[in-house]
C-alpha cells in the first residue's frame, strides 16, 4: 500500500450556443479526459439551479448537453479531505485524511494518476494541488495556490499580481483588482494548458485543471467586478440572526470572523458581488480552454468533468468561507459530465452521487480494474443512459469533523494563541479546533436530509421546503418514519464502506460488484 499526494480538478467543457447536443456514441478506446475542478464553489449559484444571475452561462450550456447532478456531494467540506477522496475514491474515514493538515497520511492502494499512467495516458496537473500528490508522479506539473503560482517561473507582471494576492490575507478585496484579466490565475492556467495539450497528440491526455478560485481571497478585475452590483443581487436566505438556530459552533465561527473583520456585516453584499464576478470569470476561462480543444480537433474525443471540492457560505448565516457543519452550501457540489458516450439530458439526473464516484467511473471508461479499497461506485452505465440499479443511487453519505468532543463556550477560546486569528493582519482561519471538533455524517435521500453526530444529536430537513436548513424536524414525531428510514440508510452506508485495506495476506478473496456497486445484488438469497 502506498501513500501519495494529489488534488482533483473539475473538467468543464463548453461553447455556449455553438455546442451541439451530444450523441451517445461510444468513445474511442482512450478518450482524452479533462477534469476541471474549482475550489469552494457553491452548487446553487447558477441559472440551471434557478439562481437569477447569469454567473455560469458556459457551464450551464454544457450541463444541459451532457449529464449533470443536483444531488452531488463532497466527501467532506474541506479541501484536503475532499481532494484526497477525489483522487482515491475513498471516504476520509478510510484515507485517514480528515483535515487540511495531514495530507501526507493518505491511505490507499492505487489512485487516479496510477490508473491513468497504467492505461497509457500522459498526465498533468495545472493548478491547485493541496493533496499528497507530488510532481514526480505526474508528466507535467504546474502548481498554483491561493497566492499565485508556486515557483519562480513567471513574468514580472504575474509575480506582481501574486504579491497582490498575498496581501489580501485570504479575505475580500472590496475594490476592483488593479491587474487585468491576463494576470488572473485561471487565465494563466489556460495558457499553460493550451501549450501542454498542443505539444503532443500521440497519446491521450489526462489533465487535472484545478482552479484555485472562487476560494478566498475574493477578488476580481473589471468587467467582472461590476457585472453583478450589490444593489442588484438577490438577498441571502439567512443571516447572522439564524446563528442562534444553527448552534453554538456556528456562533464561534461568526465571533472569530468579526474579531478579524468587525465591518464585515455592512459589506456582505459587496463580498457576494465579487464572488459572483469570480464565477463569471472562471466560466469565461473554461470557454477559452474548450475553444482550444476544438481548434486542435480533439474536442469530440474528450470527456470533460466539472466539479468543485466543496462550497462556501457566501453570506448565508452571516458567514463566508467554510468551517462549520454539513449544510448544503458547503457539502453539495456542482458535477457535470460531457463527452463521447455520455447521453445528453437537459434535466438534472435524479441519482445521488459523490466526489468519490469519479475515480471508479474513469477506471471503467479507460478499461482498467477499479482498485481494491475504492468505495465509490462507477457512474458509467448511468452516464450512458443504460440500465442501472436505482436503489444504488437513491441516497448518499458525507462526512465532517476531525473527531474528539465538541469545544464549547466553557472552553478556552484564545483564537490568536490557537493560530486561527491574527487581528493585526485582519486574517482568520475558518478551519480551526472549534469549527472542526466532533464527528458528523450527512445522509441525503430525495427531498430529505439527515445530519447526525457522535453524541446522537440529529437534524432532519425537508430540502424542498427548507433549503437553508433552519427548521429542524428531527424531534417532530410526525416525521419519525422518515427519520428512521434515513437513519437506516446512514447505517447501511457506514457498514457497506468498511475499509478492506490492508489486504489480508494470502487469505480471503474480496468479492466486489464489477461496477463497485455497494447495495445492488448484495442481499443473501433466501
Predicted features and spans:
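Short, structured active-site-proximal loop/turn typified by the sulfatase FGly-forming signature C/S-X-P-X-R
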Residues: 47-83, 89-90, 94, 117-124, ...
Amino acid at each position: 500500500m502506498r501513500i501519495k499526494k494529489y488534488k482533483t480538478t473539475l473538467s468543464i467543457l463548453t461553447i455556449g450556443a455553438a455546442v451541439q447536443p451530444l450523441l451517445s456514441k461510444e468513445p474511442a478506446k482512450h478518450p482524452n479526459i479533462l477534469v476541471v475542478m474549482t475550489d469552494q464553489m457553491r452548487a446553487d449559484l447558477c441559472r440551471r439551479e434557478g439562481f437569477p444571475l447569469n454567473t455560469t452561462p458556459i457551464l450551464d450550456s454544457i450541463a444541459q448537453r451532457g449529464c449533470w447532478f443536483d444531488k452531488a456531494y463532497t466527501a467532506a467540506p474541506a479541501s484536503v479531505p475532499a481532494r484526497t477522496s477525489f483522487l482515491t475514491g475513498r471516504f476520509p474515514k478510510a484515507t485517514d485524511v480528515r483535515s487540511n493538515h495531514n495530507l501526507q497520511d493518505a491511505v490507499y492502494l492505487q489512485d487516479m494518476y496510477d490508473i491513468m499512467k497504467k492505461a497509457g495516458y500522459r498526465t498533468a496537473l495545472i493548478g491547485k494541488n493541496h493533496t499528497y500528490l507530488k510532481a514526480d508522479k505526474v508528466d507535467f506539473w504546474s502548481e498554483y495556490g491561493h497566492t499565485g503560482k508556486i515557483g519562480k517561473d513567471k513574468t514580472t507582471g504575474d509575480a506582481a499580481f501574486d504579491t497582490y494576492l498575498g496581501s489580501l490575507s485570504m479575505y475580500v478585496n472590496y475594490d476592483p483588482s488593479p491587474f487585468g484579466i491576463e494576470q488572473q490565475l485561471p487565465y494563466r492556467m489556460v495558457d499553460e494548458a493550451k501549450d501542454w495539450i498542443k505539444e503532443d497528440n500521440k497519446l491521450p491526455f489526462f489533465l487535472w485543471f484545478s482552479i484555485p478560485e472562487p476560494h478566498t481571497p475574493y477578488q476580481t478585475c473589471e468587467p467582472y467586478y461590476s457585472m453583478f452590483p450589490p444593489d442588484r443581487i438577490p438577498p441571502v436566505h439567512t443571516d447572522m440572526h439564524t446563528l442562534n438556530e444553527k448552534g453554538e459552533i456556528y456562533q464561534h465561527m461568526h465571533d472569530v470572523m468579526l474579531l478579524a473583520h468587525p465591518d464585515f456585516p455592512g459589506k456582505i453584499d459587496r463580498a457576494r458581488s465579487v464572488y459572483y464576478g469570480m464565477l463569471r470569470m472562471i466560466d469565461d476561462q473554461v470557454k477559452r480552454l474548450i475553444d482550444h480543444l476544438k481548434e486542435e480537433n480533439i474536442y469530440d474525443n474528450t470527456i470533460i468533468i466539472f466539479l468543485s471540492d466543496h462550497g462556501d457560505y457566501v453570506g448565508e448565516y452571516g458567514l463566508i468561507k467554510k468551517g462549520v457543519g454539513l449544510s448544503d452550501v458547503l457539502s453539495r457540489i456542482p458535477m457535470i459530465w460531457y463527452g463521447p458516450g455520455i447521453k445528453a439530458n437537459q434535466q438534472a439526473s435524479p441519482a445521488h452521487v459523490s466526489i468519490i464516484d469519479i475515480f471508479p467511473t474513469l477506471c471503467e471508461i479507460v478499461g482498467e480494474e477499479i482498485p481494491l479499497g475504492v468505495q465509490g461506485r462507477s457512474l458509467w452505465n448511468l452516464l450512458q443512459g443504460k440500465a442501472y440499479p436505482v436503489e444504488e443511487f437513491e441516497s448518499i453519505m458525507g462526512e465532517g469533523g476531525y473527531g474528539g468532543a465538541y469545544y464549547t463556550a466553557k472552553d478556552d477560546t484564545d483564537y490568536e494563541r490557537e493560530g486561527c486569528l491574527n487581528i493585526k493582519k485582519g486574517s482568520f482561519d475558518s478551519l480551526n479546533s472549534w469549527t472542526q471538533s466532533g464527528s458528523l455524517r450527512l445522509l441525503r435521500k430525495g427531498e430529505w436530509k439527515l445530519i447526525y453526530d457522535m453524541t446522537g444529536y440529529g437534524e432532519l430537513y425537508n430540502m424542498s421546503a427548507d433549503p437553508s436548513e433552519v427548521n429542524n424536524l428531527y424531534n417532530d414525531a410526525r416525521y419519525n418514519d422518515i427519520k428512521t428510514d434515513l437513519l437506516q440508510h446512514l447505517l447501511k452506508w457506514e457498514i457497506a464502506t468498511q475499509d478492506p485495506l490492508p489486504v489480508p495476506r494470502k487469505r480471503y478473496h474480496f468479492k466486489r460488484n464489477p461496477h463497485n456497486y455497494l447495495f445492488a445484488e448484495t442481499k443473501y438469497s433466501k
